Amino acid sequence: GRANRLAVTVMQLGLNVKVDDHLVVPGQDITITATLTDYGVRDADLVMFSLEAGDWVRVDLVEPVNREVSEKGDASVTYTPYIPQDLRPTIPHEEMLFEPHFLEPQYTVVARVKSASGTLELRKPILLDVAPPVSVAFVEAPYLIRRGIDDTAAMNILLTNHTPGAKSVTLELSVPKGLSASQKKFTVDFASAGGQKIVPITLKLAKNLEARDYVLSATIVGSDASAEGIARVVDLEIPHDIRVGVIQSYDTTFINTLARFNVPHEALTIEDFTPERLDAFSTIIVDIRAYLVRPDLVANNQALLDYVKRGGTAIVMYHKTFEWKKEFAPYPLSLGRNRVTVEDAPITVLEPKHALFNTPNVIVATDWDGWKQERGLYFPSRWDDRYTPLIDCNDPGESPPPGSCLITRYGDGTYLYTALGWYRQLRELHPGTLRIFANMLAL
């Protein structure tokens, strides 16, 4: 309690605990060294150490041991507990967040010190990361497969050795009907702990695959370590003969999506704001909040507008109110704080014959289903009459101006400002968003 903590402070006692390995696997022995130090006047003579374990850890109890405090003022003890075979993994953290005991220490070192004022107790919890001997993960899943166009799909499986020393395992692949792999078992050898190996997989695709998710699984034979990877088959047309420049912010979604599309693309730098460089691109994407983090864009915004005027297409993604100036756009455009937080809020297409909804992919009502998080935020609240609103969307009971997707002709080119959360959906390979994004590239 409080009195105990106060007495420990007054006596200037400290308990230091060292663990030889904080990332452990079931079946491993670890070494815990605990040292009690009396930093003040020597008033601690005898220390009783004990090692406690959480009731879910189930280890053999270790009898408390007494240690005399040395002339230097310290006393130490070493424990070598065995990590039980059935101890649940805690990594990867993002998958284990809601497991029982996720953030609870598996062990606690307790030091009880006898003094003139009674017995004082110091406690030091030990939180370990528990890993399977070898972990397995699909890299960059879900995988995009274009129905009727792709006849093979390549993917990578990452194996990581957490076992101290060398390790050899067998990886077994399970493939759903419609996909096939020439090899389904792989032997993987590791020289030491922390080693990683990539196992490349090539799948053959049956003709006339249905557009849906196909779930693959990879398992380390003889263990509980496994992972699932989704191959997402999508009806998707991608425009030909395009080249895309991205004025990137802190996000990589658009670059990653263009790579998945196999579309030639480049991340633009300060050296690229010249007519010769910009005109090399059919479309330039201004990434989310780029005007906040790219001062070179702010300084060279006129070069971007001139690019549009000469016939280019600029697609500007969402920004927050304070980082946007209405003169960034070719005609005045002011951002508000309107947002649509309901992820399945109805979408009304205001210009159904517009190319954005028809070329090369025809967009239908179901393309808007299954969004993650909100529809969008910081929608434009006022804009010049030369913009055409393409989409209306609002939360129930609200009716903000339809500014979530505004398009205009400027000179010989096209300028699109859109505050919808496309990037979140593209990260997830949302099929409808993939189709609309491909249509944006064709504007």
Residue ranges and their predicted role:
Residues 1-19, 26-28, 40, 414:
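Mature extracytoplasmic or organellar-lumen-exposed domains after removal of signal/transit peptides
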Residues 130-151, 162-163, 169-171, 233-237, ...:
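Extracellular ligand-binding/catalytic regions of CAZymes and related secreted enzymes
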Residues 223-287, 318-321, 341-342, 424:
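Aromatic-Pro/Gly-enriched surface loop or interdomain linker
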Residues 255, 278, 301-305, 434-437:
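Extracytoplasmic/secreted envelope proteins and their assembly/folding machinery
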Residues 269-274, 299-302, 399-405:
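Alpha-helical scaffolding within the catalytic cores
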Residues 289-369, 418, 432:
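A glycine-rich, often tryptophan-bearing local segment used as a flexible ligand/cofactor-contacting loop or short
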